[in-house]
Amino acid sequence: MGHSRRPVGGEKKSRGFGRSKAAADVGDGRQAGKPQVKKAVFESTKKKEIGVSDLTLLSKISNEAINDNLKLRFEHDEIYTYIGHVLVSVNPFRDLGIYTDNVLESYRGKNRLEVPPHVFAVAESAYYNMKSYKDNQCVIISGESGAGKTEAAKRIMQYIASVSGGTDSSIQQIKEMVLATNPLLESFGNAKTLRNNNSSRFGKYLELEFNTNGEPVGANITNYLLEKSRVVGQITNERNFHIFYQFTKAAPQKYRDMFGIQQPQSYLYTSRSKCYDVPGIDDSAEFRDTVNAMNVIGMTESEQDNVFRMLAAILWIGNVQFAEDDSGNAAITDQSVVDFIAYLLEVDAAQVNKAFTIRVMETARGGRRGSIYEVPLNTVQALAVRDALAKAIYFNLFDWIVQRVNSSLAARGEIANSIGILDIYGFEIFEKNSFEQLCINYVNEKLQQIFIQLTLKAEQDEYAREQIQWTPIKYFDNKVVCSLIEDKRPPGVFAALNDACATAHADSGAADNTFVGRLNFLSQNPNFENRQGQFIVKHYAGDVSYAVTGMTDKNKDQLLKDLLNLVGSSGNQFVHTLFPEQVNQDDKRRPPTASDKIKASANDLVATLMKAQPSYIRTIKPNDNKAPREYNVGNVLHQIKYLGLQENVRIRRAGFAYRQTFDKFVERFYLLSPKTSYAGDYTWTGSAESGARQILKDTSIPAEEYQMGITKVFVKTPETLFALEAMRDRYWHNMAIRIQRAWRNYLRYRIECATRIQRFWRRTTGGLEFIKLRDQGHQLLNGRKERRRMSLLGSRRFLGDYIGVGNKGGPGEMVRNGAGISGSEDILFSCRGEVLVSKFGRSSKPAPRILVLTNRHIYIIAQNILNNQLVISSERTIPIGAIKAISASNLKDDWFSIVVGSAQEPDPLLSCVFKTELFTHLNNALRGQLNLKIADHIEYSKKPGKMATVKVVKDPAVTGDDTYKSSTIHTGAGEPASSVSKPTPRPKPVSARPVTKGKLLRPGGPGGGPSKLASRPTPAAQPLPRATPQPAAAQPAAPQPAARVVPQPVAAVAASHARTGSTASVRAPPPPPPAAAPAPKKPTAKALYDFNSQQPNELSIKAGEIVQIVSKEGNGWWLCMNMATSSQGWTPEAYLEEQVAPAPKPTPPPPPPAAPRSTPTPVNGAAAAAKAKPAPPAPPAKRPNMAGRKAVPAPPPAPRDSAVSMNSHDSSGGSGRGTPNSASNASLAGGLAEALRARQHAMQGKNDDDDDW
């Protein structure tokens, strides 16, 4: 992604998270030229959005709607949400795995709209804008304690350190030191609170400094509002600063010996709250990280020793205990503790005793030094002095650590720009709020004021710069609350507090009462309420009640001169470094109070932030229990209100919920317009602005829903953006469907091509094994037996299992189960046949049986009806090894016997139309050892051990099946014994069918070549023929329309037949103009017979039906179309009679002037003859010879059932299917005669053999 450029000669563009590209050519302020648009790609890893990722896109703007959206996203582990350029973060209280290096890299160089909301997106935007626009940046992180501010600050530092580049060793060292400041400052500045286990108890503004190349060259840290009161006291279940527990638990033995370090339970300052451990925090490991961070920033061992010396001194100072002496004054109970403190601070123990128990006071008169008094302290005052010394040491030690870090992070090159990260603990409301909460909340009020001013100002500036009309939104400006606290005139809370401290400085109780009196002057302020012992300030985050007690003492925030003199007398140079100020005994001016320091720090911070371009992160804590998946709706709703998220959304949505630069808008949505895209490529040649207009026009977005600025598109409502995004998603969906359709079509094409190749190959070679079996049958007979004509058909195949006994399911399985055929036996042959059955006292007769040959047995299976149920059983089972011979005749009959020679059973005499095939399979099963006896008779054992002979005679009277009578078989003449099967007939031509449909692939295939099928007749590709009318005699060149008949009275009609004289006739009217020639009608044909289609490309017709002729083929088939259903198919020409269109009647000439009387026509004359109905023409004698087609006529004599459907031809060469016999009729209709002549012509060029079926 290229860097953006600033507008030439113009003001800076508004920048936030998103990257804005300025116009490349600035003339009238609008973009010119074709934008550089990246090709759109489908986001394959894009997750389905949960709720809305930008709160400005909410349909309903309310605190509850914001809360519901945040809750929904939180429950789906989406903790980040935008409000325009503001990031809202909800603390998950667990590791979601979203800060890995891979995630970090996914945000490098990305616009915020290209990636989901994330703190890395804020860091990327800040770094990008600093590097591209040379503007200082700052990231303001706000929220209450435990909301995740510190974590967000660390992640920003992590991202910037990763992407800022720089291979120089000094730059890498700066990065390491910047990252090392986190564990160091967290140890000294963070603590466990009730709401957060790692709560920052100070404010930090980290300023990262960069050179012109965007490489870090230094950093600077400014700290604010350290909660030093935590050093001396904590409430139950809270802890002191982390460093005290790290040091007492994991200090090396050297420090334990030097500084007397013991466990945290031994010190008052670490044991008062009875909380020593924190879940999820290893103090020992954290101590090692702290020491390592000290080493990284370059802290020497001597400096580290002094730091830990001061920590030890603070811990031992807390163990100093006081008791009342006889005078009621404070007395130290354990002098050894004081002695050890003096050893640590390198001061005199007597001075420590005096500083803790005696206060030196000085009186002054008229500006002159007065008397000096030593005033003993009571135990309460002594404890206060003790705690004040501990707090002062730790406060100054923390400042020294920050300064030491800054000295190590000092810039090592020229500073061009900076990025500031403000991490300050947020708004606090406790049951009891004091001076610390007032200062914290005051600083947060100042930050909120900056946020409102800069956010609103940025919106107003952008609308003005883009020349957009908008309506200002009312919002709460908290400037009045800031003035209530910080103003001097009229005096605010801080001014009243300082005045009370100056007026009654000696007595803290009197000072507090004075402060309460001063607050009465603020009662007229609508944001303030004064109550007994406390006052209420109406902050932007809610009303907070502050307790007055002790507030003046905390505001004084100064050490007694006795304590300053004590540390000033130290022999340790490091102590002097912590307390560099020399005590001026003559200085009578009031030192600055804590409120003065807070006010000055806050104003300096505001001034620093106003010099930078801000980014905002608003953190939210979902619950007070630090539970990972708990979302407290009430608590979050309260935070939403005091963070002002609803007002922020309203300001951001001040008329427009979405805005984007022209080029980015076009890059995102150019797919939605056919004029700006083609096949996913950007095709618009105009400017980005015109492209954006075209997209909005083609997507039918109403003009009132958007405005075009100078460089941006402004969309009014979120629903419009949702619609655009939905259309974009739908585009990818549609493209995916197209690709899938094309791919599926291509797969179908491949499958169809493979199927056709396979079909052709199987048609060519697939039946070879069956043909080989058929040839083996010829060899087995060896010219010894006459053949039946049907056995010699070229299409005859020895398929074997005709009943399907070897199949799973169907009637074949029933036969197998009924006959008890073992599953281990292979079925070689099955067919229906007959067996000669001898009955006592009756002549033998054939009976139907089922013959099954396996690799082991021959089964003769009978089917009987028993109790109205079909019973299938094996009548006889003959092992093939027991067969001695097969006896058959030399004629064409189907009878044969299986010679077994059994002593118990006779030999079976069988009849089977597929006898030769049975012989062949049996011979193969016997490995060629079959003894086939062929003679003029058939031998078999009619009874066990008694041979009989059956004669076979040729009887010309037998034209059908063989007949058996009295041991003689009568059969007709057959084909010569030397006959062999005819060649396999060529299949009839079929209409070409395209390989694919839908125009996705050409009929010729992916290569685009012409299909070979195109040469075949295709119904859709044939031109429609035109009917040619028969010529009529004396037909005029241009036919005239018939004259319109006008009804006349009866008298007039009668008069027209009367004889008239030769008087002059009345002139006839002129004839009407000739009409246009009618369009030629399409040829039709009438069905003479019923025809039932047998193939998918044939058309069924009924006798008398009229069909339209599409094309005629010379092979006896016409392509016709059913005019009712528009279905097309092939129909036999012989079944149709073409309807000849009658010639149009010529226009009758005009009537003559005088018509002679006509002679009446006899009733029984020519007219009557013409009206006579002609005799119907005889149907054709024979259908065209078409193998494989079933005919409709009267059925032939029922053949013997062989379980095979075949087109049996009679011996006379007929089709085997009778058609109506032709009657001798001298006159045939013209259409039928023409059809018969065409058929005869077509048949003359072919051999009229019986193999073409």
Curated annotation (Swiss-Prot):
Q: Which UniProt key words apply to this protein?
A: Actin-binding, ATP-binding, Cytoplasm, Cytoskeleton, Hydrolase, Motor protein, Myosin, Nucleotide-binding, Phosphoprotein, Repeat, SH3 domain
Q: Which organism is it from?
A: Aspergillus clavatus (strain ATCC 1007 / CBS 513.65 / DSM 816 / NCTC 3887 / NRRL 1 / QM 1276 / 107)
Which residue positions does Phosphoserine occur at? S371
| PANTHER family on file | MYOSIN, MYOSIN-3-RELATED
Q: Name one Pfam family in it.
A: Myosin_head
CDD domains, from UniProt?
MYSc_Myo1, SH3_Myosin-I_fungi
Alphabetized GO MF terms = actin filament binding; Arp2/3 complex binding; ATP binding; hydrolase activity; microfilament motor activity
Swiss-Prot/TrEMBL domain comment: The myosin motor domain displays actin-stimulated ATPase activity and generates a mechanochemical force.
- Compositional bias of kind Pro residues: 1068-1081, 1143-1155
Q: Could you tell me the superkingdom of the organism this chain comes from? A: Eukaryota
SMART domains membership: MYSc, SH3
- Kindly list the biological process annotations in GO that this record carries: actin cortical patch assembly; actin cortical patch localization; actin filament organization; endocytosis; mitotic cytokinesis
User: Which InterPro entries does the UniProt entry name for this protein?
Assistant: Fungal_myosin-I_SH3, Kinesin_motor_dom_sf, Myo1_CA, Myosin_head_motor_dom-like, Myosin_TH1, MYSc_Myo1, P-loop_NTPase, SH3-like_dom_sf
Record protein name field: Myosin-1
UniProt-annotated binding residues for ATP: G143, E144, S145, G146, A147, G148, K149, T150
Q: Which SUPFAM superfamilies match?
A: P-loop containing nucleoside triphosphate hydrolases (SSF52540), SH3-domain (SSF50044)
Span list, region Actin-binding: 418-500
Gene that this sequence comes from: myoA
Provide the primary localization.
Answer: cytoplasm
